[in-house]
Curated annotation (Swiss-Prot):
GTP binds at residues 225-230, 244-250, 269-272, 334-337. It comes from Shewanella woodyi (strain ATCC 51908 / MS32). GO terms for molecular function: GTP binding; GTPase activity; metal ion binding. The keyword Cell membrane does not apply. This is tRNA modification GTPase MnmE. It is found in: Cytoplasm. The gene is mnmE.
Amino acid sequence: MTTDTIVAQATAPGRGGVGIIRISGDKASDVAMAVLGHLPKTRYADYCDFKDAENAVIDQGIALYFQGPNSFTGEDVLELQGHGGQIVLDMLIKRVMEVDGVRIAKPGEFSEQAFMNDKMDLTQAEAIADLIDATSEQAAKSALNSLQGEFSVQIHELVEQVTNLRLYVEAAIDFPDEEVDFLSDGKIAGSLNRIITKLDSVQASAKQGAIIREGMKVVIAGRPNAGKSSLLNALAGKESAIVTEIAGTTRDVLREHIHLDGMPLHIIDTAGLRDTDDTVEMIGIERAWAEIETADQVLFMVDGTTTDAVDPREIWPDFIDRLPKNLGITVVRNKADITGEPLTVTQDHGHSVFKISAKTGLGVESLQQHLKSLMGYQSNLEGGFIARRRHLEALDLASSHLMIGKEQLEVYLAGELLAEELRMTQMALSEITGKFTSDDLLGKIFSSFCIGK
């Protein structure tokens, strides 16, 4: 960990009412003496002049001094709050850097120092960047929950449960004459199943948190001329796709990025799926399947004039069989303006079924509400936490090790192998909070932060 004293502008670049310069490190008190002529009382606002080396006033403002470890970074911290003109702030930073041992901070270095000094864990540090980058109220609330430790608490509870079970299993191994009795008495199996259930719940919440942060990818798929492009236009609120009566008009992937009550939604319109000898259309269909395989949800567009069915497997079994196993499906029966069907929303075989007219827009608002609910939209903004892809990957890895460990217990009564899988589970979970994390990963995470954070 660096021992340098770092400085950066904490407020956004450009013109503003107030501009803040943040200094952190052992030289913070030296900076105060050089720029202010005195060391402010700890944790008190001090209105004073900010002066250059010739004792000329650069600016006037408020100085705040926090003595480590009682500061954001855990080090001595000085904040200079002056006027928000960029020239003045640049002059002030230049003056601060005249003090020996002070350098410009790297992106995210203040948060990194806070992490290194155990002022926060890695999920909380990431939540700072996510709160700054939030594109919706729900994302901001979820990021704040993570910053306050909601996600961390869930992970710490899991790690503690896994650790306790691992200790129990290893104790059984230490008494080989009784090991089989320990492993088969049901206590270990019960504890393991409770951990798996808890992890499943955290995974579900984390997946929702990732969607809130990154947006949900929704692919509109179906046969040609089912109204996919009309639905894209209706959801986007503009003519993004060409719509004709000719089947196969859309031959490539069309993308629109919209917000529903601030929730980010990535809509993908795809080529109609059918057997064809047309080379260009075949390429479009291949791209359509590539998008489907990475989607969070599929809107299965059905031409309501061609069938009365609502069960997707009855409508097109080959299509359903090819979909990824855990991919969510929403059935959209289109052309209600022609069929005269009531604009209803029903559940059939575990799938939501919407009857709409993409052309006229009838029923589209209900579909939008459905998509918002899938993204985790809550009008009261309560609960939930933000999550990143790396968190999901670590949770998936932990789940995989637990399932392997369960097999070692139930099939082979192999205590040593179960203990090893529990150790690997513990490592995967601890990587989320940063207890066991490579320096390369830390560098990648913090380098994505703003300078001054």
